[in-house]
Regions:
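A compositional/biophysical signature of low hydrophobicity enriched in polar/charged and small residues
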Residues: 1-93
């Protein structure tokens, strides 16, 4: 499994529309609107690098209103949330 964080700039009037459209693309697990240098942060979880390349260069490239993107690959997750999820599989409260 490959996890990527994709930083997106979009036309101001299209930010919400871009976010909605991105959230419906298979392989994209989360879309956040954020403050700062970028407008949106996208978390993608795909099978391999080829699938990531397809996602970024074909599926995301077709979303109207995206003006720039920067893709970062995640090497390792240190989030407590992710670790709790791994150990909770099969257990119920």
């Amino acid at each position: 499994m490959v996890t990527a964080i994709i930083l997106i700039n979009a036309l101001r009037e299209r930010i919400n529309g871009v976010a909605q459209e991105l959230s419906g693309i298979p392989g994209i697990s989360e879309v956040f609107s954020v403050s700062g240098r970028y407008d949106l942060v996208v978390v993608a979880r795909v099978r391999d690098n080829d699938e990531l390349a397809e996602l970024v260069t074909n599926r995301m490239a077709g979303v109207e209103g995206i003006t720039a993107s920067e893709t970062m690959l995640a090497f390792r997750a240190f989030s407590k949330h992710d670790l709790e999820g791994m150990f909770a599989v099969g257990f119920e409260d």
